[in-house]
């Protein structure tokens, strides 16, 4: 937020782009008008209208007194789904077989985007783009790799 304010104070009027730490509400309260029109990438947006996201949001709100799930909730859910899928494919919870099944995860439908693990076990999935518009975070699009 402070970098955005400084950029605006220096006369920079270009759109600014940040990472997933920008989703903190303090960005809006501290940055004010300086963050208007900025963008950031993250893992998830409850505004995404994909069936996986809308179903997750509905179930979460029903379970947690109408609270809207944040990115950490979505990532935690997806991690549990990767594990459940790997257990099912491995047919066991034996550690070596489970490790291999997790490593073999490919295009698993997920709330944060279809998940594929590469040879180094890094997740490859969509990046979600959010814009700050009228003082609010707004979903723009999910960009698949």
Ranges and model annotations:
Residues 1-145:
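Extracytosolic ligand-binding ectodomains
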């Amino acid at each position: 937020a402070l970098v955005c304010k400084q950029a605006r104070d220096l006369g920079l009027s270009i759109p600014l782009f940040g990472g997933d730490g920008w989703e903190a509400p303090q960005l809006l309260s501290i940055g004010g008008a300086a963050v208007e029109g900025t963008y950031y990438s993250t893992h998830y947006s409850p505004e995404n209208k994909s069936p996986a996201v809308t179903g997750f949001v509905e179930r979460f709100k029903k379970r947690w007194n109408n609270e809207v799930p944040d990115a950490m909730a979505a990532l935690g859910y997806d991690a549990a789904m990767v594990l459940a899928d790997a257990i099912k494919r491995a047919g066991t919870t034996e550690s070596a077989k489970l490790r291999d099944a997790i490593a073999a995860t490919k295009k698993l439908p997920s709330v944060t985007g279809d998940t594929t693990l590469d040879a180094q076990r890094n997740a490859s999935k969509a990046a979600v783009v959010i814009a700050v518009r009228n003082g609010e975070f707004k979903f723009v699009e999910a960009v698949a790799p």
